[in-house]
Amino acid sequence: MMKKILNIRLSYLYPTLFVLFFLALTRFTPTKLTAGQLALYSVNTFLFGFYFSPLLSAQKGRVDELIKTVRKETMILLDILTQSHLLKAEDRHQLKIRLRTYMESIIDKPDVKADNVYYDELLHFTKQEKYKDNSVMNVIYERVAKTQENRDTIQNVSLNRVYSHEWLVTLVLFGITLYFVMQTDYGSVIFFRALLAVLCTGLSLMIIILAKYATLTHKQAKRMWTPLKQLRTDHFEDITADEIKDMRAYVAKQRD
């Protein structure tokens, strides 16, 4: 349920939440806040902003780092493809099958790991005895070896999520802030009720945006794999699904 909600675009959530809060405010009975309640509201608001901002900044930075690393991985693979034009046609095709199979093992996968069996197969293929004196294949081997660092970065950064206790503190502070906002005495002026609805909607969207970044469902995060997908589309049209299937079976057999 939550996953479906997080996949809804923010442009759709905003008007929906605004209407819900506007209707909710019509049923709330505003109260005059005492000096003590106002002090509590002020302290809570400060704590919410103080605690929330670093979390959002860290998760946005996490997504930016993932995008940067995937682009770096794409450039390495593109360099390998460029170098492969100097190989014999059959050797190049076999290399591309292994590259495509490797790419399929990481694209859109939430559990990318530094240890990758298709990466191992690429290393083994490029380091065969028959390529010992092949300078082009030696360069490709070095490029392939560099991808391990990228996968390690993706794995480590992906694990840097918002922990449960951080969510608990954030949601408690958010709930208190939202409650005080909805208790504000706006009188009978509809305009101020609309302003409060906008404020409540904004607060809620901030939490949703944090959740989207944390779960990598934000629009920015969804574009993370675009460079690799584009590379796959532009340079691997000659690799068939059967060839990828056979390569997976071959690698699985080698592991047994």
Where are the model-predicted features located?
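Loop-to-helix transition at the N-terminal end of transmembrane alpha-helices
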Residues: 33-47
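Structured inter-helical modules in multipass membrane proteins
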Residues: 67, 72, 78-159
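Alpha-helical transmembrane anchor segments
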Residues: 2-31, 159-254
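Juxtamembrane membrane-interface segments at transmembrane alpha-helix termini
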Residues: 54, 80-85, 205-214
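Transmembrane signal-anchor/signal-peptide helices with a preference for the extracytoplasmic
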Residues: 47-70
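Charged, low-complexity cytosol-facing tails and large interhelical loops of integral membrane proteins
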Residues: 103-112, 244-256
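Short extracytoplasmic
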Residues: 52, 85-86, 238-243
